A protein has these predicted regions:
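A short, internal acetyl-CoA/4′-phosphopantetheine-binding micro-motif in the GNAT/acyltransferase core
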Residues: 91-99
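Conserved GNAT-fold acetyl-CoA-binding loop/helix
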Residues: 14, 18-21, 25-48
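Conserved N-terminal entry element of GNAT/NAT acetyltransferase domains
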Residues: 1-18
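Conserved acetyl-CoA-binding loop-helix of GNAT-fold acetyltransferases
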Residues: 99-106
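Short coil/turn motifs at secondary-structure junctions
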Residues: 76-78, 96
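Conserved beta-strand in the GNAT
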Residues: 58-60, 66-75, 87, 92
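A short, polar/charged loop-to-alpha-helix boundary motif
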Residues: 78-84
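A short helix-loop-beta-strand connector motif used in the catalytic cores of GNAT acetyltransferases and
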Residues: 48-60
Length: 106
């Protein structure tokens, strides 16, 4: 039986940081993400920069203990609704899971 784990990423956790960078870089290299790898300078600074932002958070998904997806989010505020909101900046699913229904939880 498969296992699914969803966690709020700790930007200072080396394993979670590596998983975040690997998933995001995979997305960046896909045509949907621009078709180019993240620049080395971005890879070197992204985790520290995200950690400095109190309104940033990343949710990581693991399937069978392997990184399967992420969502990068930023807290904001809607002036039209006068309420807080979550801006979803990146949504990534590992290419190995694209088109697969073996993980359907319905």
């Amino acid at each position: 039986m498969m296992s699914i784990e969803i966690v709020i990423a700790d930007y200072q956790n080396p394993a979670q940081g590596n998983d975040l960078l690997m998933l995001l870089d995979g997305y960046a290299q896909d045509p949907m993400g621009g078709g180019e790898a993240l620049p080395p300078a971005v890879k070197a600074s992204l985790l520290a920069e995200l950690a400095r932002l109190p309104h940033a958070f990343t949710v990581l998904a693991y399937v069978d203990n392997k990184p399967a997806g992420l969502i990068n989010c930023f807290l904001g505020f809607s002036t039209f609704a006068a309420k807080p909101l979550v801006n979803i900046h990146d949504v990534v699913v590992s290419a190995s899971l694209w088109g697969s229904d073996q993980y359907y939880i319905g």
